[in-house]
Amino acid sequence: MQRSISLTAKRLFVHWNLQGIGNPPTVPSFFNLCGSGCWERSFASASGDYREILRNRLSDIIKVDDAVDLFGDMVKSRPFPSIVEFNKLLSAVAKMNKFELVISLGEQMQTLGISHDLYTYSIFINCFCRRSQLSLALAVLAKMMKLGYEPDIVTLSSLLNGYCHSKRISDAVALVDQMVEMGYKPDTFTFTTLIHGLFLHNKASEAVALVDQMVQRGCQPDLVTYGTVVNGLCKRGDIDLALSLLKKMEKGKIEADVVIYNTIIDGLCKYKHMDDALNLFTEMDNKGIRPDVFTYSSLISCLCNYGRWSDASRLLSDMIERKINPNVVTFSALIDAFVKEGKLVEAEKLYDEMIKRSIDPDIFTYSSLINGFCMHDRLDEAKHMFELMISKDCFPNVVTYSTLIKGFCKAKRVEEGMELFREMSQRGLVGNTVTYTTLIHGFFQARDCDNAQMVFKQMVSVGVHPNILTYNILLDGLCKNGKLAKAMVVFEYLQRSTMEPDIYTYNIMIEGMCKAGKVEDGWELFCNLSLKGVSPNVIAYNTMISGFCRKGSKEEADSLLKKMKEDGPLPNSGTYNTLIRARLRDGDREASAELIKEMRSCGFAGDASTIGLVTNMLHDGRLDKSFLDMLS
């Protein structure tokens, strides 16, 4: 492409000014702008001929030190190697994502008098763009044009990528238009870069439309283009559009690969289209596209989330038969599923299989097993697993700690749970709502009301927001520990806040009031439930009936029973047993017998408290054996 360099430069400067950048920064030595963190080291002599490495073994350089040593050999050589050879090394380092090192090496080349060419500058522009330093990328472009280099399509595509990642998508679109105007022909890579940028900025319709525009401009989308679009659509949940694009792609000359199928299968799994994902898996297999570990892991993980652990196990066996090695994600998903299904033995067997295959468990694996041990009251083994993961340099997160703390609190070992909480804080981890709520509940269960309140106060002071479950546990604990006045203060604050109390909150307060002898207050709150948009459930009715019975207000209790039978919710075993005990204590044998018959006709039986009361009254002669027979 023959274009006037001065014309190109002029138009690019116009483009910058139009985008509100002004003239690009003037940079006497732009490499100095990479900051004090640039790579510095004295070059050691490396063994071997650098030419042979650059020619045949450049792909072997996977460590930064190897690259720096090779650069050291090159700059010691006389004459200096060609710029082409330096570019090979810089490109290899850029592929390691060590962009700062690329800039630093470029600076040292400049200091040594090794001139950069168009390709070198393009590498630098790409590095600055990848580091989201667009102004420095523009400065390099300005410098290279000042030196007489015409930017090529690769250079401008890198700049385009910089615009996309700097959240300047409108500038990116304008740059492509400017490129066309200047006589450049955007290639597949250019368009794919812009498509990716459009998806990054939630412009899915524009991204999809650009695929058709590519064809109209004589540029055919390739597998990477389609993969970018499919990935963007799946992340947005537009799975149907992704599937139609797959069909359109396969009707053309491009064959979908396992990566595209994996993307759609994973999208289907995430958006709960499990059966469609399995059908697509079968379809790809029938087309001769071999699934890989990612395919199986997505499906297994999704099946586990749906509780279909037997199907997940079948897929695991299938992949092993096909010599596709499961990875930590595959095993962890199954282990977690088995734990949640209560099949801890199977989970342990899978863990043993992981170790046998030299697959290192990750934090998710360990956390799942710790949860399993806690669920089965095997706390010592849970603690051992916790210590094992730390010894393997797999450090627990808040979820892991919270799981183990919950296990200790459940086992009424709340002090050990609190010790874990302190250890977690010392590691710099901040407990979340679940952590604090678990401890508050644990202390209330241990009848340690003071420490429960202390933990709640600490929770609020560090900025962790209580949820409605936290408040319900706090209110319930205060009420059951005879601190109704404090509970009322919290309840009134809750009603003024933006958080909506639920039916459980109201039930707790109604019960607290009734048990504290404030039945009228409880009744007032009960009657106001409908005004708050909350329908009383059977527990609310039973609580109120129990309160009336305790107060001796039999008529009000009977009235509520009648209302339940007429309007719902229907009475349950608790309703009848509460009323039967109240009538028995009042010596009303006839009413008690009628209630027992009604209860039995509804399919309910006497509970332990009722049978115990009848047995005691039978022993002291207040009842005859017929009552016990009726109950049983």
UniProtKB/Swiss-Prot annotation:
Q: Name one GO cellular component term.
A: mitochondrion
Q: Which Pfam families match?
A: PPR_1, PPR_2
Instruction: Specify whether Repeat is a keyword of the entry.
Output: yes
Q: Where are the PPR repeats?
A: 46-81, 82-116, 117-151, 152-186, 187-221, 222-256, 257-291, 292-326, 327-361, 362-396, 397-431, 432-466, 467-501, 502-536, 537-571, 572-606
Keyword Repeat in annotation: yes
InterPro entries recorded: Pentatricopeptide_rpt (IPR002885), PPR/CCM1_RNA-binding (IPR051222), TPR-like_helical_dom_sf (IPR011990)
Q: Which UniProt keywords apply?
A: Repeat
Q: Which GO terms describe its biological process?
A: mitochondrial mRNA 5'-end processing
- Entry superkingdom: Eukaryota
- Record PROSITE patterns: PPR
Which PANTHER family does the record associate with it? PENTACOTRIPEPTIDE-REPEAT REGION OF PRORP DOMAIN-CONTAINING PROTEIN, TETRATRICOPEPTIDE REPEAT (TPR)-LIKE SUPERFAMILY PROTEIN-RELATED
Tell me its family. Answer: Belongs to the PPR family. P subfamily.
Query: Per its record, how is this protein called by name?
Result: Pentatricopeptide repeat-containing protein At1g62910
